[in-house]
Amino acid sequence: MPFLELTLSCSEVTLPRFQNALDDVGALAVTMLDADADTSNERAILEPGVGEMPLWDRLTMTALFDGDSDALVVLAALEAFDPGLDWSQVAFRMVEDSDWERAWMDLFKPMQFGERTFIVPWNHALPEAADTPEAAVVRLDPGLAFGSGTHQTTALCLRWLDSLAGSGELQGRSVLDFGCGSGILAVAALKLGATHAVGVDNDPQALLATADNAQRNGVDAQLAVYMPQDEPVQTYQVVVANILASALDALADTLAARVAPGGRIALSGILHGQEDDLLKRYAPWFEQLRCERDEDWMRIDGVRRG
């Protein structure tokens, strides 16, 4: 079945008006992307707080309508909400259902992190390299923009977990995934040999996503999720926190207290240039601190002092 696709450039200020207009004329789906993606002006938006919806300054909005929708009706609705609309920033085209499916498949493909960790979308066959007893395969819904493995902050953590598994430091361990998002790190840790994991996030939707992904991957009996205020006060042998540098700084005492003596910690969500302050911040509790870089992003990991 064909669909009518609208592409529109807008700003954070004009976005609400256009959203209302598109809803009024029957948009089936609306997506927003950073219009400055892959440029020097690209701005990363990671884990927002509850009730927050941070957006880019310039956006590319794509809306999908039934194939028999009238493009002129859509244009009239847009003009009613913004008479000064720049029509050169508006484009329509007809797309087949298969085009969307193919684009989806092309965008999200199986990914390997380290020697044995694979993130595989549900709509993909298992790659040959992952079809071995040693492989740790995490199946994810490719609709997850953050926490799908495609961002460097997540990739840095997945490679770290894979390296722990390779050295035998994850088998039989307990894991805390602080700022769990989709739960990809907690689920991967369990697939790599950890016996129990806890996911903590201040977004209730993230906890639902984590629980759902754990169930789909058959590790739900080993994983519990909590809001920060409800998390049991205990220590873990492995702690990973993929949040923002400002939050890592503010939560240093809390995160350090969650790591058992001799346990391992990984901190991610750190832009290059922010790592020195965080290294100093965590040095009182951790030794063997080191950094790994992936493009503009850094990971810090270390061992809890005894």
UniProtKB/Swiss-Prot annotation:
Query: Which CDD domains is this protein grouped with?
Result: AdoMet_MTases (cd02440)
Q: Name one GO cellular component term.
A: cytosol
Reaction(s) catalysed by this chain, per the record, are: L-lysyl-[protein] + 3 S-adenosyl-L-methionine = N(6),N(6),N(6)-trimethyl-L-lysyl-[protein] + 3 S-adenosyl-L-homocysteine + 3 H(+)
Q: Which Pfam families match?
A: PrmA
Query: In the Enzyme Commission scheme, what number(s) does this protein have?
Result: 2.1.1.-
Which UniProt keywords are present, listed alphabetically?
A: Cytoplasm, Methyltransferase, S-adenosyl-L-methionine, Transferase
Q: Where does S-adenosyl-L-methionine bind?
A: T154, G179, D201, N242
Q: Which cysteines are joined by disulfide bonds?
A: none
Keyword Magnesium on entry: no
Query: Where is this chain primarily localised?
Result: cytoplasm
Gene Ontology biological process terms, A to Z:
methylation
From the Swiss-Prot or TrEMBL record, state where the protein is found. Cytoplasm
User: Gene3D superfamilies, per this entry?
Assistant: Vaccinia Virus protein VP39
InterPro entries, per database record: Ribosomal_L11_MeTrfase_PrmA (IPR050078), Ribosomal_PrmA_MeTrfase (IPR004498), SAM-dependent_MTases_sf (IPR029063)
Q: Which GO terms describe its molecular function?
A: protein-lysine N-methyltransferase activity
Q: Would you identify the family this protein belongs to, as annotated?
A: Belongs to the methyltransferase superfamily. PrmA family.
NCBIfam families noted in UniProt: prmA (TIGR00406)
**Protein function:** Methylates ribosomal protein L11.
* Protein name (database record): Ribosomal protein L11 methyltransferase
Which organism encodes this protein? Xanthomonas axonopodis pv. citri (strain 306)
